[in-house]
Amino acid sequence: MSWSSHPPSVIFYILSLLSSACLAYVATRDNCCILDERFGSYCPTTCGIADFLNNYQTSVDKDLRTLEGILYQVENKTSEARELVKAIQISYNPDQPSKPNNIESATKNSKSMMEEIMKYETLISTHESTIRFLQEVYNSNSQKIVNLRDKVVQLEANCQEPCQDTVKIHDVTGRDCQDVANKGAKESGLYFIRPLKAKQFLVYCEIDGSGNGWTVFQKRLDGSLDFKKNWIQYKEGFGHLSPTGTGNTEFWLGNEKIHLISTQSSIPYVLRIQLEDWNGRTSTADYASFKVTGENDKYRLTYAYFIGGDAGDAFDGYDFGDDSSDKFFTSHNGMQFSTWDSDNDKYDGNCAEQVGIGWWMNKCHAGHLNGVYYQGGTYSKTSTPNGYDNGIIWATWKSRWYSMKKTTMKIIPLNRLAIGEGQQHQLGGAKQVGVEHHVEIEYD
């Protein structure tokens, strides 16, 4: 590309036309489909792409202004070079005989002029390369803007009709999922519940053929959700509740909601932990009288006793062989919840900060179902940022260096545990409270 073949005025004119073609698209609630905030993104919307288009256009306009400035500098430098060449041509007369006393002076002047010409030629070449690069960037950005506008048009066409929610939320409501099942609900899925002294919120209820209604508050499936969250996020909950019985999303219901459910009834709740390894083997661990206190007590976890389950009682701690006090300092009963920005554990440091994830920490843990998701299960000290076991672990079933493939944490009133599912053999200590037959749940 030569400078003479692309006059600056022409390039400026082209750039001006291209810049004026970037029209801003302002997204409002009138021209976007606004979905109910309770659900995930189940309907197409133009708002996100429109916002991105506006931001992207601002960046392109800035690049254009920079390009115009560079072109202006190049034009000035080129004009200076042309004037210099013209002056050389005028001063040079081949017919005039050289005077001996002027030879040295003329030689110096010629050398200086040649150096100036070479300098300007180098500068022009550099600016031409910059112009070519910026032109390529501009062309690429222009094409991206065109593509985004096409997508906006497509989405606007799709949203001419009111968006239809594809999420099925059942009409039955109750204090928890067992109350929902008692009122006739027979299908697992999304339900609104309203615990005592609380506003209603959405939960996933797992309802079996025996009428047992489990309220699910944690799900790990595939590592698609990052559990490295702060205190507020763990309090409010994060992730998406699955609208289908397959349970195909990961989520944490929220510490405040878990507290409201687990402390509302005179009948205690059972916590069931379900685990699956990377070979498809499953196991469970059940805990009686599970509760989570309020935020003023840092959402402290408590339970009465371990009922049973082939996963073992990791909440009671585990002797890793590192120290004689391992089991005591890795137990979880009575521990407050900790996150990287709210240290409430028994360790001098911050266990949650070491692993980056919220949990009921001691010094630190024998079971951690919110841990880092490791594909394939096995990991080692060298694969962690600081050498600590930070996977999805349950030390009484698998090694601390084995991360589970799937986990579920769910609760149900204690008087339902022995009904169906062949759970009678797991009651163990539950017989101490005299639960031998079906009793409908009662609330204070």
UniProtKB/Swiss-Prot annotation:
| Regions annotated as coiled coil | 25-165
State how it assembles: Heterohexamer; disulfide linked. Contains 2 sets of 3 non-identical chains (alpha, beta and gamma). The 2 heterotrimers are in head to head conformation with the N-termini in a small central domain.
GO CC terms for this protein? collagen-containing extracellular matrix; extracellular space; fibrinogen complex
Cross-referenced SMART domains: FBG, Fib_alpha
Which domain of life, per UniProt?
Eukaryota
Subcellular localization(s) per the UniProt record:
Secreted
Glycan attachment points? 76
Supply the domain comment.
A long coiled coil structure formed by 3 polypeptide chains connects the central nodule to the C-terminal domains (distal nodules). The long C-terminal ends of the alpha chains fold back, contributing a fourth strand to the coiled coil structure.
Biological process (GO) annotations held by this record are: cell-matrix adhesion; platelet aggregation; protein polymerization
Question: Its Gene Ontology molecular function terms?
Answer: metal ion binding; signaling receptor binding
Q: What is its main location?
A: secreted
Q: Which Pfam families match?
A: Fib_alpha (PF08702), Fibrinogen_C (PF00147)
What CDD domains is this protein classified in?
Answer: FReD
All disulfide bonds of the chain are: 177-205, 351-364
User: Is NAD found in the keyword set?
Assistant: no
Q: Which residues form the Fibrinogen C-terminal domain?
A: 168-415
Report the leader peptide range: 1-24
> What protein name applies here?
Fibrinogen gamma-B chain
